[in-house]
Amino acid sequence: MLNKSLLTPTTSEIVTQAFVNFCCEVYKMNHDGFHGYKHWMRVLHNGRLLAKAEGASMKVVELFCLLHDTQRKNENVDPEHGHRAAEFACTQNGIWFDVNNDEMQLLYEALSYHSDGYTEGDITVQVCWDADRLDLGRVGIKPSPSRLCTITSKSPAVLDAAYQRSVNFIPY
């Protein structure tokens, strides 16, 4: 069960408290684990920072940040969770959010392949992947700039700040 005392994120067109609550309810694992709400909030913080700096679609990035791990079945190896998240996102378009075909294609790609280690793609997809990878400190891994996609995420200041948030489990 989610600790309701957690601070809520800054809202936007996409990030509403109702949508965050929905994502939390859809997630079937413990939110105190490695892939729960606190992780999503750090990824959201990273994603917003990167999207602004890199000129990526904030709408797609915010959706990715909230949806990317909602379909996990376990905390360990779950190679299909990204594909399940992408399919799930398709079912929610027009219900919880509205994105056009181009935005949906970017979101689908970002969700489907976010755990596969790719570094090439549209800048919005790259921002999504880096937002998640910058939070690897939570599992004892310091992100390597060679495995990141964007210039902003590779900068020592951004990389170090994200790593400190992740190892100290600061929600955002």
Predicted regions and their residues:
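His-Asp-centered metal-binding catalytic motifs of divalent-metal-dependent phosphohydrolases/nucleases
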Residues: 58-76, 81, 85, 108-115, ...
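Divalent metal-dependent phosphate-bond-processing catalytic cores, especially two-metal-ion Mg2+/Mn2+ enzymes
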Residues: 1-14, 18, 28-56, 67, ...
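Short, amphipathic alpha-helical segments
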Residues: 79, 83, 101, 105, ...
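An active-site-proximal "capping" alpha-helix that borders the catalytic cofactor pocket
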Residues: 43-47, 80-96
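Short, well-structured alpha-helical segments
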Residues: 37, 41, 62, 101-112
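Short gly/ser-rich anion-binding loops that grip negatively charged ligand groups
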Residues: 33, 75, 79, 97
